[in-house]
């Protein structure tokens, strides 16, 4: 079954038959020692920290997939109002939350 996902509150041309509630995927990541060292050096001289960007992108994708799995467990075929949120966990960890409202269309 294909999961339709939007950041909007509806799907154009579709009728939402049932709202199933909030679904989410949460991932907490921290950089490896080498990523931390390289990131520290880059923060001194400036520039893009590629290892951190890659780590964050993987965390977002994993959180997104976990949100879809949560919606599938509710037999949803759509997610509306999808959002990302991030936060720090301690000094070394980053939390990525992906959430939305599961629906049947």
From Swiss-Prot:
Gene3D superfamilies: Hypothetical protein apc22750. Chain B. Belongs to the UPF0145 family. This is UPF0145 protein lpg0197. Pfam families: YbjQ_1. Signal peptide: none annotated. Disulfide bonds: none annotated. SUPFAM superfamilies: YbjQ-like.
């Amino acid at each position: 079954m294909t999961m339709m996902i939007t950041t909007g509150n509806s799907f154009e041309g579709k009728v939402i038959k049932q709202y199933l509630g909030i679904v989410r995927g949460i991932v907490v990541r921290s950089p490896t020692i080498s990523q931390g060292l390289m990131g520290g050096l880059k923060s001194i001289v400036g520039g893009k920290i590629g290892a951190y960007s890659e780590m964050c992108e993987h965390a977002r994708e994993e959180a997104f997939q976990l949100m879809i799995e949560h919606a599938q467990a509710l037999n949803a075929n759509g997610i509306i109002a999808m959002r990302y949120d991030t936060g720090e966990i301690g000094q070394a960890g980053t939390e990525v939350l992906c959430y939305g409202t599961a629906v049947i269309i």
